[in-house]
Amino acid sequence: MKVRPSVKKICPKCKVIRRKGVLRVICENPRHKQRQG
């Protein structure tokens, strides 16, 4: 899980979702998981 000021899709399988007001990126590849900090 990377915590970043701006989250972006890294590959075509990444999805940007909003959970409890927090932007997150979920993906098949665990290295692509991100959260807006």
Curated annotation (Swiss-Prot):
**Any single GO CC term annotated in Swiss-Prot or TrEMBL for this entry:** ribosome
Q: Which GO terms describe its biological process?
A: translation
Query: One Pfam family, short name please?
Result: Ribosomal_L36
> Superkingdom of this entry's organism?
Bacteria
Molecular function (GO) terms for this protein are: structural constituent of ribosome
**Keywords assigned:** Ribonucleoprotein, Ribosomal protein
- HAMAP family registered for this protein in UniProt: Ribosomal_bL36
Q: Which family does it belong to?
A: Belongs to the bacterial ribosomal protein bL36 family.
Protein name, entry field = Large ribosomal subunit protein bL36
Originating species: Desulfovibrio desulfuricans (strain ATCC 27774 / DSM 6949 / MB)
